[in-house]
Amino acid sequence: MKIDVEVIKELRQITGAGIGDCKEALESCSGDMDKAREYLREKGLSKAYKKSHRDVADGLVAVFAEGDVGAILKLGSETDFVARNEKFRSLALGLVRGLYGYGVEDLEGFSASSYDGSRVADEIVAAAAVLGENVVLSGVGFVKLSGPGVIGSYVHGMVSEGLGKAAALVVLEGGPHSDELASFAKQLAMHIVAAKPEALSIDTLSSDVVDRERELVARQVEALGKPDSVAQKIIEGRMQKFFEEMVLLEQVFVMDGQTKIRDLLVQKGQSLKHEIRIAAYRLFAIA
């Protein structure tokens, strides 16, 4: 059957597929738009799976926070060219809002969940077919206030609202929402993106990571031939510097270069007349 060119254009606009593929789909489905979309989806999936072995070195981080909930995810692509494609950006924003509604930090579960009449995983593979590159959802994060407080966010290298090359969410609890607290939360999110902490506190830093570092430092100090009492002080000093690099609460605030984050929380709490604490944070970045 002859397919009207405007119908072909409409299907192309909806799916992002090529003109020839859209024409073929409509002809195979007797002009039925919904069936043609499904036809393209199935055809696209087979193409995309062939790309799934390729490395993803680029992409975008998407973040969405509203009220007492925040969501963040990392969507990978092979090149920056595709990462800046409108379809890729739209997918990332749609997925992060879907994660916001899904309400659980579970990559596997979210990937299997419903999205736009399909599954998240299938939508990603279909997008890969249209974009011509491997597309991978490599990480999801979800945070929620458990009491009075605020969720702050920051996007670095922003290409559009809520999308960039790195982003962070931070949950501040202990005081009622205020402009001052919200501004402070954003500053902390900016610090997190810049300083890239591996853990919130020393207690939450992986014991394996700490043990490996302590063993390395001990070997280095042993080579100095110092008395045990002196060597132990050197080890503890170097471990403290290690924690100041790795642990958020021990880091020096990048905006003033002198105040530790844990001390900054005390200062802000005194200003707001409420004890303020960081309940959680999430950070994703494109390497």
UniProtKB/Swiss-Prot annotation:
Entry-linked PROSITE patterns: EF_TS_1
Cellular compartment(s): Cytoplasm
InterPro entries: EF-Ts_dimer_sf, Transl_elong_EFTs/EF1B, Transl_elong_EFTs/EF1B_dimer, Transl_elong_Ts_CS, UBA-like_sf
Keyword entries, A-Z: Cytoplasm, Elongation factor, Protein biosynthesis
Transmembrane segments: none
Stretches assigned to coiled coil: none
GO CC entries: cytoplasm
GO molecular function, one term: translation elongation factor activity
Family, per entry: Belongs to the EF-Ts family.
Function, in words: Associates with the EF-Tu.GDP complex and induces the exchange of GDP to GTP. It remains bound to the aminoacyl-tRNA.EF-Tu.GTP complex up to the GTP hydrolysis stage on the ribosome.
Protein's name in the database: Elongation factor Ts
Native species: Anaplasma phagocytophilum (strain HZ)
